[in-house]
């Protein structure tokens, strides 16, 4: 990936622990290093509406800590030192990520999306669609490859 540069000083990568978010974070580390950008990772703990936003959700909090620890390992493997990783609590991930991009004045949000095929076409989920439509900065998608068909 040498020679690829992104015109951004501050990059936000939402992570959720799936393969797509790990792959896109690794790619974002390479982009940030090439572009000399600051990289921010965010994990959103979605709190159900029937619970107070401050509710202790141990399992989700533990999962977030594990995911962010993995993100820091990836950053170290990619020799990127300037990485800020944190978790947020919100009702819905999409608006929380857009607010994070606004509040921290991000130049780009890079999203990893898994390959999904419904009704004959590739689709985005509600979080990705919300970010695409509402983020105040560039939005870049990295989608997994389609699975290789198994030949019988």
Enumerate the predicted regions with their spans.
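Structural beta-alpha unit
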Residues: 1-6, 76-109, 129, 146-152
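Small/aliphatic-rich secondary-structure junction motif
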Residues: 2-54, 58, 77-78, 82-83, ...
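Short, well-ordered secondary-structure micro-motifs
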Residues: 24, 51-54, 95-98, 121-122, ...
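Conserved hydrophobic residues forming the short capping helix/wall of the S-adenosyl-L-methionine
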Residues: 32, 71-75, 101
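Short secondary-structure boundary segments
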Residues: 43, 112-114, 143-144
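A short acidic, glycine-rich active-site loop
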Residues: 56-67
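Glycine-rich, Arg-bearing micro-motifs that act as flexible, cationic patches
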Residues: 108-134, 148-151
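Short, flexible loop segments at boundaries between secondary-structure elements
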Residues: 137-149
């Amino acid at each position: 990936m040498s020679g690829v540069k992104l015109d951004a000083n501050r990059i936000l990568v939402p992570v959720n622990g799936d393969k797509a978010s790990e792959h896109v974070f690794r790619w974002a580390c390479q982009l940030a290093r090439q572009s000399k950008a600051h990289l921010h990772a965010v994990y959103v703990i979605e709190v159900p509406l029937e619970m107070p936003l401050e509710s202790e959700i141990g399992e989700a909090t533990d999962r977030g800590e594990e995911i962010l620890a993995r993100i820091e390992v990836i950053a170290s493997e990619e020799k990127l030192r300037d990485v800020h990783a944190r978790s947020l609590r919100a009702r819905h991930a999409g608006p929380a990520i857009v607010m994070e991009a606004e509040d921290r004045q991000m130049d780009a949000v890079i999203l990893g999306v898994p390959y999904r095929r419904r009704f004959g076409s590739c689709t985005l989920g509600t979080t990705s669609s919300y970010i695409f439509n509402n983020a105040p900065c560039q939005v870049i998608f990295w989608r997994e490859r389609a699975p290789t068909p198994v030949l019988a």
